[in-house]
Amino acid sequence: MNMSNDSSDLNKDLIAFLKGSVSKYHAVSQIVNILSNKGFSLLREDQEWNLKRGGKYFVVRNNSSVIGFINGERSLQDTGVKIIGAHTDSPSLTLKPNPITYSSGYSQLGVEVYGGALLKPWFDRDLSVAGRIVFKNSTGDIGEKLIDFERPICVIPSLAIHLNRDANGNSPINPQTDILPILSQNIEGQKPLDEMYFNSEISDKFLKKGEILLDHDLNLYDVQPPSMVGFNEEFISSQRLDNL
């Protein structure tokens, strides 16, 4: 059984969107690009709007939410309003402001559960980090950038079955202790990966000379890309699918 060309193209577009939406900020950035390419114009909330009938517009707030709309050709009383809504964010594990912690010879990331997340699927995955950073440039201006390490930099390993005999049962997961990803092994005689080193890696990879990292809003994501599954490739398997 083969899908129609229209369905195939739609699935490819959806998969590309899901793959690129590694954080809410990346999702909004993609939506803005889609709307702009479709002829929508950006409206700024600090400016007066001059809306035209039939005009296509969008508004972005905090770079984490976006509203696009088409102004009707006729009066609102005649046409009414049609609204479609979706999330730009998804349940995830978000890095704490000072995320580096240590345990049993490892540097780990301190994370908080964001939203109604299923925790078991996060174990034994190749995890990367993405989101938004805020920085100050050489002239003192504040800016922001979207970042994505684009490679697995941490993992939340499961305990071996002989250390947790109830692993296949109703073994509870403590979000404060059981889902801290391992980031690096601390070798005796060498300085462990600490907060300063982690921030310097972000600065070296994503900031220009003279730019100073001030803050971040980052989350983990599984680097495995979305895919079509099933004997006839009739299903889409992807994280974030039910939100975006």
Residue ranges and their predicted role:
Residues 1-244:
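N-terminal hydrophobic/helix-forming segments and targeting peptides
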